[in-house]
A protein has these predicted regions:
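Flexible loop/turn segments at secondary-structure boundaries
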Residues: 45-46, 83-84, 261-264, 363
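SAM-dependent methyltransferase catalytic region
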Residues: 1-104, 110, 114, 123, ...
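Hydrophobic alpha-helical membrane-insertion segments
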Residues: 49, 265, 356-358
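Short, amphipathic C-terminal "tail helix"
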Residues: 351, 355-365
């Protein structure tokens, strides 16, 4: 549950947030019947790790309790992370996307359009839930304070368990999905591929720094890191590796686990190839390769706008976990890839090509 002290304030500044989400019958506590619920609920509580990945979202608890009260209308403004990710939001997302009473979503890619001067990675949205509505949702998308698109559509499509926020991307997604190819995510490791993410204790989120050196010794292997306020290459004993020992002597590609902020116009995944006898910190994910040539061809694919476009459909924060690659199809990596080649393979129209080109790195020379 949520810590009561976070939401009970001094007299005169009393907060009803705790009562609303914890009382079995909050209507009795408030001495009122709820016909319309409108709100901007608390977004998260900190668990010792600040405002980043360790901040536990709680806004979903207010939405769930509001729906349970069965008013006629609910409208709340919340972070948009729940569309495709967010810590502990999987069940909430599943319920929301299956709820046919979701009549409208107004999605702001940049949260500062609603809250000037405030950064909320992934943007914010407000929704209209209507007890008497049953149908597809009308999705409004805003960029730079302007309405960019509006579409009445399902919240979920076959083969996905997330909300694809960009209306104009739906037909492109369907066209690519029709090829029924394996997902690129199957090639990408899970978090912390070599087991270096060790914390002081279950309640203390401070990291235990791996014992690595900057000079090579006889029994050491290469150690790629991107944390502790710097990045580079160190050396570490193979004995310090806690899992996936079989990956140490493979040729592999490393990709960062955190990239940008969820902004398709600037976020860029930059892969790099590392030779065998190597490992990395938990700030990277690993793509195993059978040869140097295959690794080069995979990198050529990752560097395309096409690839980044499909990642963008699931990546709305800085997190670039294995899951964000789920909608990206695998290719034949006996050959290299370019955007032109990919657009032709999937039969994209010129309008669809222009959409991708303008969404992903539009200012690229």
């Amino acid at each position: 549950g949520v810590n009561k002290k976070l939401y009970q304030r001094n007299k005169g500044l009393e907060s009803y947030a705790y009562s609303f989400i914890h009382e079995d019958k909050p209507e009795e506590a408030f001495n009122m019947k709820f016909d319309v619920i409108i709100g901007n609920p608390p977004y998260q509580m900190n668990d010792g790790g600040g405002m980043g990945a360790s901040a536990m979202p709680i806004y979903q608890k207010f939405v769930e309790k509001a729906i349970k009260l069965s008013p006629t209308y609910i409208s709340m403004i919340v972070p948009s992370r729940w569309f495709a990710g967010g810590r502990g939001l999987k069940d909430f997302r599943k319920k929301m996307l299956a709820d046919k009473r979701m009549q409208e979503i107004h999605d702001f890619i940049d949260a500062s359009d609603c809250f000037p001067g405030v950064e909320i990675k992934g943007g914010v949205n407000f929704f209209l839930w209507n007890k008497n509505f049953d149908g597809d949702c009308t999705v409004h998308t805003y960029e730079s304070s302007q309405l960019k698109s509006k579409m009445k559509r399902p919240l979920m499509f076959e083969g996905t368990d997330v909300f694809i926020r960009y209306n104009d991307s739906i037909e492109i997604f369907k066209k690519i999905k029709s090829f029924e190819e394996k997902s690129f995510s199957q090639l990408v490791s899970g978090n912390d591929p070599f087991g270096f993410d060790i914390r002081v204790s279950p309640t203390d989120y401070r990291r235990v720094k791996p014992k690595y050196a900057l000079k090579k010794s006889n029994e050491s292997i290469l150690f790629y890191y991107n944390n502790w306020s710097k990045e580079g290459i160190g050396y570490i004993s193979e004995k310090e590796v806690n899992k996936n020992h079989h990956l140490i002597n493979e040729i592999k590609i490393l990709v960062p686990k955190a990239v940008g902020s969820g902004d398709a116009s600037t976020d860029e995944i930059k892969p790099f190839i590392v030779e065998s006898s190597s490992c990395c910190s938990e700030t990277y994910l690993v793509i195993k390769c059978s040869s140097k040539k295959e690794a080069e061809n995979i990198c050529s694919y990752i560097k395309t706008k096409f690839f980044h476009f499909l990642v963008t459909l699931l990546k709305n924060t800085q997190g670039a976990y294995q899951k964000v690659y789920e909608l990206v199809p695998q290719q034949n990596f006996d050959e290299s890839w370019t955007d032109k080649k990919l657009y032709k393979k999937y039969g994209l129209s010129q309008n669809q090509i222009d959409y991708i080109e303008n969404l992903v790195w539009p200012n690229e020379d």
